[in-house]
Amino acid sequence: MVNLNIKAMRYLSAEDFRTLTAVEMGSRNHEVVPTNMINQIAKIRGGSCTKSLSVLFMHKLIAKVPHISYEGYRLTYAGYDYLALKALSKRASVYSVGNQIGVGKESDVYVVGDQKGKQYILKIHRLGRISFRSVKNNRDYLRNRKTGSWQYLSRLAATKEFAFMKILHEHGFPVPAPIDHSRHCIIMEMIDAFPLRAVTDIRDPPALYQTLMDIIVRFARNGLIHGDFNEFNIIVREDGTAVVIDFPQMVSTSHPDAQFYFDRDVQCIVQYFEKNYQYKGDVPNFEDISKMEKENNLDIMIEASGFNKKQSKELEKYRQEEEKRKENGDDLSDNYEEEEEEKE
C-alpha cells in the first residue's frame, strides 16, 4: 500500500515542482530518467536541478534504482500523487486531504475538502504495482509485458472512469457526480451511503434486487455493461436507494465478450441476494435486451468524449496480463515504493 503524505507539498518550491514534472515527462520513454535529461527538460535557471533533485529524493517523490549504468531517477507513486494534487489544487478542486476510507488492489480512496469546507471523494488509481525485487526474480515479466508503465496505465484507468462517470451522470444514472480529474486521480461527489456488503438490514430486499437488475438492464439498453457489478461497487443510502461506483472495467455491449460480462454482473447480484436474503427474483436475459430498441449509444458517445478504443484495448490487455500472472502463480509484490534495495 502507498501512503498519501502531503506534508512536504507546502515546502516545495516552483523549481522543485518543475523538476518533478521533468522527471514525469522523461518517464514517458525511460523507466529511469537520466539526470542530464531531467536538467534539459526542466530548464531551470543556472542549468542544474541538483538541489531540487536532492529535495525530491529526500521526500521520496523520486527514487534511485541500483545496478544501472547511468545516473538517473524514477518517478514514485508519491511523486505522481504530488503532481496530480498540485494540478487539482490550482483548479481549486482540492484544498485539504483527510482520512483514507478505502484501499484496493488498484486504487486508494480518501476524503478531501475544498476551500469552502465541502467534502468530496478522491480516488487514486494505482495500476501495475510491481516490486523491483520481485521483478528480479521474474525477469521475463517486464520484457514480455505489452502494456505501458504503471503511471500511464493508472492515468488511463482514471481517464476512463471519469469519462464514464460523467456521461452516466449526465444521463440520469445513479452514480456520483464527477468533479475533476488529473493524471491518475479523480475527484467525485461524496455520498452518504454504505457499501452493499456492509449493509446488514435491507428494508425491502426484493425492491432493491429489482432496482439493481433494472440498472444492469438500463446500462445495456444504453450500450454499456458495468463489468464489475457486485456488493463492493454498489453503495446504499439510508433510504434504501442504490448508487453505483467504480467504472474502470465498463465495456460496450458490442464487446466480443459482452454477454459474458453481462451474465457475470447479473449472477453477482443473484448470488448475493440468494445467500444473504434467501431471495431469488427474475433474471434478465442479454439476448432479449439486445433485441430491444436502444435508449442511447453511450458507448459511442464515450469514445467521442476522448477515451478511444485504442486506450480501452490497452487497459484490457493489462487486465488480461494480470489474470495470466495470477493463473501462473507469479508472486509480484504490491509494495513498489519501499524496497530495502533502493535505499542509500
Swiss-Prot record:
What InterPro entries does the entry give? Kinase-like_dom_sf (IPR011009), Rio2 (IPR030484), RIO2_wHTH_N (IPR015285), RIO_dom (IPR018934), RIO_kinase (IPR000687), RIO_kinase_CS (IPR018935), WH-like_DNA-bd_sf (IPR036388), WH_DNA-bd_sf (IPR036390)
* Root EC class: transferase
UniProt-annotated binding residues for ATP: 123
Kindly identify the residues recorded as the active site.
228 (proton acceptor)
Top-rank taxon, per record: Eukaryota
EC number of the protein: 2.7.11.1
Biological processes annotated in GO: maturation of SSU-rRNA
What is the protein's known function?
A: Required for the final endonucleolytic cleavage of 20S pre-rRNA at site D in the cytoplasm, converting it into the mature 18S rRNA. Involved in normal export of the pre-40S particles from the nucleus to the cytoplasm.
Name of this chain's protein: Serine/threonine-protein kinase rio2
Question: From which source organism is this entry?
Answer: Schizosaccharomyces pombe (strain 972 / ATCC 24843)
Lineage, please?
A: Eukaryota, Fungi, Dikarya, Ascomycota, Taphrinomycotina
